[in-house]
Amino acid sequence: VQMFRLRRRVFRDRLDWTVSVSGDLEIDIYDALAPTYVLVVSDDYDVLGCVRLLSTTGPTMLADTFPILLGDKEAPRSELILESSRFCVDTDRAVELGPHGINRATFVLFAAMLETMRAKGANAIVTVTDVRMERILRRAGWPLERLTEPRKLGQTTALAGYLRDSDLALEAMYRQAGLEGPVVRNQPEGRKAA
């Protein structure tokens, strides 16, 4: 429940996106498709950040909600490619900054995404994001490979792209988060905690 509350605070309240809200929770149709949720949690088990990973062999946000961001390309459909969505960090609770002014929890969440991608046998993540997040990824050392040029969607300049599996990116996340190695701890089915 904490994760869905965080998503509402970030995507509806702060970013003012048009998202599905039920009470104080942000939940959409993709949450019903057995995604894997990757969470960054505090020592007290408060959710500090989250991201949703979904197989691209079924419905995805890129293919089914934002196909306009594909241009003339086909949506990725492969067991080797996951889709990430709903990436967010609670900057009110996770206040520790790492290099480049990026929140430390962001580096931990990026590392957990890479680890989870590998654990699922995938070699890439496709995502719909905005140009602000694209800059954060580049500064963090995990550059987004654009599918097409950005487009204005409402108040957001959005784009789609790939995040490839990379030893260099994973090492950069560990280093910038001040960690020695793996961050993922297995939790109940469909959830991973970092």
What is the predicted function of each stretch?
Residues 1-24, 29, 37-41, 47:
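Short amphipathic alpha-helix that is part of the acyltransferase structural core
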Residues 21-27, 31-36, 60-72:
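Short acidic (Asp/Glu) patches
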Residues 34-36, 49, 157:
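Residues that flank catalytic or metal-binding motifs in active/ligand-binding sites
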Residues 37-40, 52, 113-114:
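Short, hydrophobic/aromatic-rich beta-strand segments within well-structured domains
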Residues 46-50, 82:
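Glycine-rich phosphate/pyrophosphate-binding loop shared by adenosine-nucleotide-utilizing enzymes
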Residues 59-61, 67-158:
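Acyl-donor binding region in acyl/amide transferases
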Residues 86, 151-194:
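Charge-rich, low-complexity intrinsically disordered segments
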